[in-house]
Amino acid sequence: MTKDKKHYICSNCGNTSPKWSGQCFDCGVWGSIVEEIVSTNKAIVKTGSKQDFDKLSGHVAEQLRIPTPIGELNRVLGGGLVLGSAILIGGDPGIGKSTLLLQLAASNFASKMNCLYITGEESLDQIKLRAIRLNLTNYNTDILAATNLEDIIASIEANKNNIDLVVIDSIQTITTKELSSPPGTVSQIRICANELVNYAKQNNIIILLSCHVTKDGQLAGPKILEHLVDTVLYFEGDHNNHFRILRSYKNRFGGVGEIGVFEMCGSGLIEVTNPSELFLMKREQNVIGTSIFAGIEGSRPLLMEVQALIVPSNMVTPRRSAVGWDANRLSMILAVLSSRIGLNLANYEVYLSIAGGLKIADPASDLAVAASLISAATGKPVPEHSVFFGEISLSGEIRKTAKAETRIKEAVKLGFNKIICSKLENLTYDFISSVSHLKDLKEIIR
């Protein structure tokens, strides 16, 4: 008879300790220690078997990549799904994870690949009703409602010759009989994910795991979950906005930082093949406090609108708020504007927003942000049909930007005829206005 053991585990890094503490001694995160009851029926095996070595220069098995019918998903994955790979998709509740996975498993992809959709959150009838709403009933995709790990693996094993792709929605609902802890705990997620990923790799099956996120946007469960899989994707978006962005944060078979853009509608997720044009649709010219940033997301050029609002404040410490951009970087740009060109906004509230619910981490967006702030502060719009890109240093100088030619081509394709950026080498166009300092930018917006 086994005896249940109690221990405390960090939900961030998975480190265990015999006593509770307010801070994890391994990763240093506060408030991440939770109590778990662990019961195991496995006997400890101390013997092993000899394994054969291989040479680094030996034969490499071909990694067969299978394109999906969803082009934006192919872009993020690096061209398609790789046999034997494990993919983790995280996102807020209701953002569209299950919709995307069901559209993949029940599309014409199912006519080429044998797909199994396993749900632990819905009944089979609920899945069928959602498939009817999304018009996905023409394809004979297998579905299974199960939450027990051993039952799932046994079901796949019995039909493994007829299964190429398995979708698990979601990993937080799966439990193993080896543990007495409830579903969604760190130990359950770690063991279940590890068993599923190992089984998929041993049998050359593609597995897609849907994952919940915490209130601060992190994947729920131990960090080791992200290390177990080959690819980590985040589904981003605002429930008040119909745009969704699928972004890769880890990819062993492709690039990191690639994005796919979708539009959520009544019939499911629709691909947005030209997001720049969609995000700038019906935009008015000569609007004070707005500018267009020519950005790069992964390998994709993307034009985004930057909006700024400046109002007088009676507070001792005026508010600075940024949506879709780093608030600390906004404070830095405001300090540089005050120090280098005398634009003092100490007694004003400053609000910055990226239109369309997008998030920008590209440092080349500094120049577009500065242009919006100068426009909002002076009451004068930026030049018509202009785009901005360039990183601002603490001295007020505009630094060179990577992939400048790609940004320029995207802007010209969408009808912009004035490019305001840092000085470029080997690129001489009449419509490029090079700026080397914030003083030059201030002269343009006047």
UniProtKB/Swiss-Prot annotation:
Gene field: radA
Record-listed ATP binding positions: 91-98
Biological function: DNA-dependent ATPase involved in processing of recombination intermediates, plays a role in repairing DNA breaks. Stimulates the branch migration of RecA-mediated strand transfer reactions, allowing the 3' invading strand to extend heteroduplex DNA faster. Binds ssDNA in the presence of ADP but not other nucleotides, has ATPase activity that is stimulated by ssDNA and various branched DNA structures, but inhibited by SSB. Does not have RecA's homology-searching function.
Zinc finger (C4-type): 10-27
Annotated PROSITE patterns: RECA_2 (PS50162)
Gene Ontology molecular-function annotations: ATP binding; ATP hydrolysis activity; ATP-dependent DNA damage sensor activity; damaged DNA binding; zinc ion binding
Record EC number: 3.6.4.-
Name under which the protein is recorded: DNA repair protein RadA
InterPro entries: AAA+_ATPase, DNA_repair_RadA, P-loop_NTPase, RecA_ATP-bd, Ribosomal_Su5_D2-typ_SF, Ribsml_uS5_D2-typ_fold_subgr, Rubredoxin_2
Keywords, alphabetical: ATP-binding, DNA damage, DNA repair, DNA-binding, Hydrolase, Metal-binding, Nucleotide-binding, Stress response, Zinc, Zinc-finger
Positions of short motif RadA KNRFG motif: 250-254
Family, per entry: Belongs to the RecA family. RadA subfamily.
GO terms (BP aspect): recombinational repair
Comment block on domains: Has a putative N-terminal zinc-finger, a middle region with homology to RecA with ATPase motifs including the RadA KNRFG motif, while the C-terminus is homologous to Lon protease.
Cellular component GO terms held in the UniProt record: cytosol
CDD domains: RadA_SMS_N
Top-rank lineage group of the source organism: Bacteria
Ranges for region Lon-protease-like: 349-446
